[in-house]
């Protein structure tokens, strides 16, 4: 999965997919009542990027729905996975469940069109703080209460704070999650980070009894780092330059080992060599 980083304006969806992304990451900020408010990152952000592009959250969802609904004039067949980077740092811990409920209602209405031919992309809820695990239950309970448990098939999870793998496992246990787990590891492109924790996550994924299904590394803009991440066995690479990742995947060393995921590839299934 080539994951376009910080796609917060509707116009950027096309831009990143046209460069080769089959997945995008979108920032979601919350107001003081735990309502998802904007798709917005703000300053500081990655080097070389405009940090200030934004939409109202529900407007972005409608644009995203158009881009991921077959038959729509804006439809992009390649776009199959969306990671919502939930900026829950502005919330109190006791608001996490509420944030999940409100997020679910927004997605149900504006993205999934109340289950009536809505957007088809797989969705990952990416939460920075393991203490905010009640967000997951708030979200999943709401989908069930609203009569759409089938949409849980489209839903995956990520704790993005680079916490110890064991602590993340505990948070999932508390949240009642087993499966559909992406594990992120990374740092802003302005800084360097080694692959120690990525390798640990990959080992958990491949152990047969770990909690992780997929591993992605962020934010990768250089060919050398892309090669290192692929060599470590990641499933996804988040990038500001999808064309760089595409170029590396076309190199002889990687062409036979990797391909770009399509809608038919289940993002919740651990890949077996």
Swiss-Prot record:
UniProt EC number: 4.6.1.-
Known catalytic reactions: an N-(acyl)-sphingosylphosphocholine = an N-(acyl)-sphingosyl-1,3-cyclic phosphate + choline; an N-(acyl)-sphingosylphosphoethanolamine = an N-(acyl)-sphingosyl-1,3-cyclic phosphate + ethanolamine; a 1-acyl-sn-glycero-3-phosphocholine = a 1-acyl-sn-glycero-2,3-cyclic phosphate + choline; a 1-acyl-sn-glycero-3-phosphoethanolamine = a 1-acyl-sn-glycero-2,3-cyclic phosphate + ethanolamine
Active-site residues (renumbered): 5, 41
A GO term for molecular function: phosphoric diester hydrolase activity
GO CC list: extracellular region
Listed GO biological process terms: killing of cells of another organism; lipid catabolic process
InterPro entries referenced in this protein's UniProt entry, alphabetically: PLC-like_Pdiesterase_TIM-brl
Protein name as catalogued: Dermonecrotic toxin LhSicTox-alphaIA1ii
